[in-house]
């Protein structure tokens, strides 16, 4: 399946955010996977419109009004995230020693 240039653009913007802005914020994401990892997976697994809806919905949860926790992209399993080298934000009960 060919990735559209719009998806590639959004993926690039997410990576740019991860490399530039995210380190300056300092506080960890309240979710697993992190919001940026969630967005990358959503763009990979779903059509663009569905991905953007899922990403917007997730970002609207990001704040003190939501407890956070494990929130996976629909159609994925936690194993897919634990195997991903992109996300270092592993929930405490899933850490390996």
From Swiss-Prot:
InterPro entries: Membr_insert_effic_factor_YidD (IPR002696)
GO cellular component: plasma membrane
Protein's membrane topology: Peripheral membrane protein
Domain of life: Bacteria
Keywords, ordered alphabetically: Cell inner membrane, Cell membrane, Membrane
Keyword rRNA-binding found: no
Cellular compartments annotated: Cell inner membrane
SMART domains found in the cross-reference section: Haemolytic (SM01234)
Role of this protein: Could be involved in insertion of integral membrane proteins into the membrane.
Family the entry assigns: Belongs to the UPF0161 family.
The protein's name in its UniProt record: Putative membrane protein insertion efficiency factor
């Amino acid at each position: 399946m060919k990735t559209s240039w719009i998806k590639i653009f959004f993926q690039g913007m997410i990576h740019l955010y991860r490399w530039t802005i995210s380190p300056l914020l300092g506080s960890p994401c309240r979710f697993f996977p992190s919001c940026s990892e969630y967005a990358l997976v959503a763009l990979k697994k779903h059509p663009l419109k569905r991905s953007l809806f899922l990403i917007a919905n997730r970002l609207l949860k990001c704040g003190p009004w939501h407890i956070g926790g494990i929130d996976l992209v629909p159609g994925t399993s936690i194993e897919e995230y634990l195997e991903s080298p992109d996300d270092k934000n592993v929930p405490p009960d899933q850490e390996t020693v």
